[in-house]
Amino acid sequence: MFSLHFVDEAFNEVFAGNGGHGIVAFRREKYVAFGGPAGGNGGKGGSVIFVGDKDETTLLKLKYQKHLKAPHGINGKNKGQNGANAPHLYVKVPLGTVFYTADNKFLGEILYDQQTLVIAKGGKGGKGNKALATFKNQAPSYAEKGDLGESFKIKTELKVLADIGLLGFPSVGKSSLISAISKAQPKVASYPFTTIKPHLGVVEVDGFSFVVADLPGLIANAHLGCGMGIQFLKHIERCRVLVHILSMESANPYQDFQTLNQELSQYNPQLLLKKQIIVTNKMDLPDALQKLTLLKQQIKDQPIIPLSLVSFDNLETLKYEMSSLLQNTPLEVAPNKNNDFKLYTLPDNQNTISVIKESDSVFVVSGKQVETFFHRTDFNNEEAVKRFNRILKKIGMEEQLQKQGAKPGDQVKICDRLFYFL
């Protein structure tokens, strides 16, 4: 059952930890001549990792914890000692949680208990001068700074994990039905929108158990946000089978059925491909049989199960129909629950260099590889700057600038710094 404060959407900013800096150090021991470099590497920054937890039922914690920050890696030490890697930040979320970027690009989802998803990856530690020593430069006087950890804004949504979704207009009897077929105890009353959050119930039929969701009532134009709107509709996407509950108290049950399907289609046409069961509730009313006869003439291609939650007529028939339809409906493809599913947000081509002519004498250079070495460089260290220039020449930036018409004395902008093209 869901907690009192059910929250199914949150907006957060994630910050993975930066890598620790490598350091410059030399061995200074008595009787050890020309001791050589001894600066250790920095440790890795912590990543932001979301973990599925079957005991979590809401995104309430995420709603109020806007910034999720993993710690930075520890700087290297002398005597060749590497800095410690930072611990990861683990964030527990309910099963059925989906992650998007701020511009609604899909990042990943959590479907199983203890499944993990790496949303923001920690930065690598910078190399100390011991690791940077080469045959040509056996005692470098520079070290690398740690890489920046990934950081960006995300949107998190919870879509309930249920096999069957009960849908219908407000007050058609969804909450009464889930109470009758399971041990769920949602609030039941005679006024509209009694259900304002999903309720789950487990139903068992001849040893086969499945989860049924009582979802908030639907009204016309729900796909535009009316009533519970999209807050309701998004939960249907997880369900394998939909049960349309039509009230015989309605003046036109067939019109209600059409409106329900129209709203599903407007929100996501794929929802109409799901298996459906039509249930007519409140069959104990005086004119219910007459309305049912007309409805069967209007809906000829789908069976209709008449139901009364007063006398519980046909309740077992409905349960067996749910069970049978579910067992003949394949599961949607999902990540292997035995393996952690991790997302890394590295671009497809890290070696691409982009050179844009901003004005007659200013050129902007960007690209993952260029920016990585930029952040690793200590620009207060002359030897480190010389190394940076050698790397840029080696990866072809100088050639790219010349192709764009750069001349000696022109300015080159990389990240937040200006350099002169020589």
From Swiss-Prot:
Q: Which residues form the OCT domain?
A: 345-422
Q: What class of enzyme is it?
A: hydrolase
Q: One Pfam family for this entry, by name?
A: MMR_HSR1
* Localization per Swiss-Prot or TrEMBL: Cytoplasm
Q: Which residues bind Mg(2+)?
A: 175, 195
Q: Which InterPro entries match?
A: G_OBG (IPR031167), GTP-bd (IPR006073), GTP-bd_Obg/CgtA (IPR014100), GTP-bd_prot_GTP1/OBG_C_sf (IPR036346), GTP1_OBG_dom (IPR006169), GTP1_OBG_dom_sf (IPR036726), OBG_GTPase (IPR045086), OCT_dom (IPR015349)
Which PROSITE patterns has this protein been placed in? G_OBG, OBG, OCT
**GO molecular function (one):** GTPase activity
List residues of the OBG-type G domain. Answer: 162-327
Obg domain mapped to chain residues: 4-161
Q: EC number(s) in its UniProt entry?
A: 3.6.5.-
According to its UniProt record, where is this protein mainly located? cytoplasm
Please report which protein family the annotation says this sequence is part of.
Belongs to the TRAFAC class OBG-HflX-like GTPase superfamily. OBG GTPase family.
> What's the subunit arrangement here?
Monomer.
Q: What does this protein do?
A: An essential GTPase which binds GTP, GDP and possibly (p)ppGpp with moderate affinity, with high nucleotide exchange rates and a fairly low GTP hydrolysis rate. Plays a role in control of the cell cycle, stress response, ribosome biogenesis and in those bacteria that undergo differentiation, in morphogenesis control.
HAMAP family cross-referenced by the UniProt entry = GTPase_Obg
What PANTHER family does the annotation carry?
A: DEVELOPMENTALLY REGULATED GTP-BINDING PROTEIN-RELATED, MITOCHONDRIAL RIBOSOME-ASSOCIATED GTPASE 2
Q: What is this protein called?
A: GTPase Obg
Q: Which organism is it from?
A: Onion yellows phytoplasma (strain OY-M)
| Lineage, top ranks | Bacteria, Bacillati, Mycoplasmatota, Mollicutes, Acholeplasmatales
Q: What is this protein's gene name?
A: obg
